[in-house]
C-alpha cells in the first residue's frame, strides 16, 4: 500500500495532550453511532502499557490519525483505536496505519490479527477488507451484542 504523501506515521506515546484530544474525538464519533454500554474505549493510559503500541499519522506536524496494536495471548494481536480526522479521511491514511500495525505484528512474530468495530462503520469495514481482513465471529472476550462486527487476518 502506498503511504499518502506528506503524512508521517510513527510509534508515539499516547500520553500527549494532542493524542488525548484525538482519542476524545474518536470516542465522540463512536458514541454517535453506538450506545455507550456497547462501546469499549481503550484509554490513553491503557495504551501506555507495555503490550500496546500506538501509531500516529502526522500531516505537517499535526496528529491526524491513529491506530494501535495490542498484543494478546497465544500470538494474537488486536487492532485498536483506529481513527482518522474527518478532514483527512479518504486519503488512505487509515490503510497506511493498518499496514504499519501488520508489519509490526509480523516482526513481533504474531500469527493472527483480530479486531472489533461497530455495526454502523462501513468506511472502517472497507479499510479492513482492503487490508486483507475477513469477517469472523466474536474475538477475544468481546460479547456478540449485535452492535459489533469482527474481523481477523492470519499472519502465519
Report the location of each language-model feature.
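C-terminal "cap" of GNAT-fold acetyltransferases
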Residues: 2-4, 8, 14-15, 111-114, ...
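Acetyl-CoA-dependent GNAT
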Residues: 3-80, 85-87, 98-100, 104, ...
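Active-site acidic-Proline motif in GNAT/NAT acetyltransferases
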Residues: 85-87, 91, 119
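Charged, amphipathic alpha-helical coiled-coil/dimerization segments
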Residues: 91, 103, 112-114
